[in-house]
Amino acid sequence: IMESLTGIMIAFLIFFSAKLIMRGELEVNNFFSFLAAMMLAYQPVRSLATLNIAINQGLAGARRILPLIDYKNEINENDSDVNIVITNAEVKFKNITFKYNSTESEVLKNVNIDILGGKMTSLVGHSGAGKSTILNLIPRFYDCNEGDITIDNQSIYSSKIQSLRKNISLVSQDTTLFDDTVRNNIAYAISDATQEQIEEAAKYSFANEFIEKLPNKYDTLIGENGIRLSGGEKQRLSIARAILKKSQIILLDEATSSLDAETESKIQSAINFLTKNRTTLVIAHRLSTILNSDKIYVIEAGKVVGEG
């Protein structure tokens, strides 16, 4: 708009100045001096208008970011918290009761679960039964209202969060990816990983099959949240991350849901490699996902109603 208005103003200026020159009321050299001065002043004025746009965009961004900066973390550490030391990675839920701040009713009620070290434990039940909540309590995305969760007889509530999460890998159906290269997305948790380690993780997660077909292979940008990848390809990158991290505790939240049979078969093979001899908690609706489980808990309305 400003460019158009400036063009119109210059056209009018030349038109009226020409009439004044023809009548002898304006000298030609004065006209060109004024026109040159006006053109020199145009760029700074235009920059001011652009600056105003940039300032407004910055203010709009600040309004979105400031609430995040001011957000108070619901999970707080105490000065007495210590680094957790994990050997067998046996996880126990002891009389856990939990409800979200936004709800009145309890989501989990007196839950007792033993997750065997180096074994696979599965949670089954209807949607909304509380399975994902159980899984999210282990890395302390939330803290329970009553009871305790221990790993190798150490309470996670007296452990430093960073040391706890360092030993946990999460693979879910909603994989979070960044607008970066394939390499950096795999090495998200291990920033100093070598190219050889990254390629090895991709190999065992079957991600190398599609990575080798990408234009720049491991240097290919995958777009915001991996928009250039399919659902199965995103899952394989997520598993590659977990393989590279080598965590002792693996959490799988419906990792093979919404996938076709061929893709699910590859994902399942990758999961089998990932979870071998590691403490694993699986949430799934498909029978194929829990066939290799050492123990199964049935969850209904926030309670354990069966195990075997």
Give the residues covered by each predicted segment.
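ABC-type nucleotide-binding domain
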Residues: 78, 84-308
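Hydrophobic/aromatic residues in alpha-helical transmembrane segments
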Residues: 13-17, 44, 61, 207
